[in-house]
Structure formats: structure tokens, C-alpha cells
Amino acid sequence: MTDVEVLISTTSPEVPLPTYAHPGDAGADITTRVDVTLAPGQRATVPTGICIALPAGYVALVHPRSGLAARHGVTIVNAPGTVDAGYRGEISVTLINTDATETVHLSKGDRIAQLVIQAVERAAFVTVESLPGSHRGEGGFGSTGVGGA
């Protein structure tokens, strides 16, 4: 595992920097900079107070926190969110409360997502008349579960 230098600024001094909970973790926890209340089924775009400058050839992916999803039904609408290397604005996270009955309250400073930094491979798309065959072929949604439990 290598450390990639990511420049960071915050919208105010009290905004916590992203933190890794354990050595070897892929995702660094990011927090909300405001109090948020999500009614059942409600979504909101939540500011984190952090801005980053990624090196060329890298992307930051914003992933849901598994504990927030498991305990409260809160996840990210466009998971994973993509922060391109050229973006310099504040990172925001669009959360949704999938619980049908319970309202969720998040307080300023609560961890709401994980930021994963990855190297990017760009594709060179090549138009062809037909694609080469494969074992899977054109089997789509649910095709690998046919005949199984």
C-alpha cells in the first residue's frame, strides 16, 4: 500500500480531516459539517466541509458507511460518488434514508461516508463489428443464478 499525497483544505477550522479508522483501511471517514434530519424516504445533499486536490491520474470515490446503512438505513444515492482530479469545490454527499418508518438525525461531525482514493485507468474505446465470444455471453441480470437457489 502506498501513500498518495492529496492536498486538502477545509471550509472552517473545526471541520475534521478525513481519518482512517484502522491501519490498512481503504476508506477514510468523512463527516457532515451541518446537522441533518432525514425523514423516511427523504434525501439531502450534505456538505462535508472538505475540498481536495488529487494528483492527475487519481479519483476519490465516496462510498456509504456500512454501519450507517445497517443501523439506520442511510446510504448514498449515487454510490459511489465520483470526485474527479480536477474538482476543487467542497465535497458533498447525497444521503437517503431508506427506512420506511424511522427518522434519522445526524449531528455536525458525524461520520457519513468513506473516501477511497484510487488510480484511474482510461479506456481507449475501439469500435468493432462484433465482440469476441465469452463463457458468459449476453447473460445479464440474474443470469448466473438460473437453476440455483
What are these regions (language model features)?
Residues 1-149:
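DUTPase catalytic domain/fold
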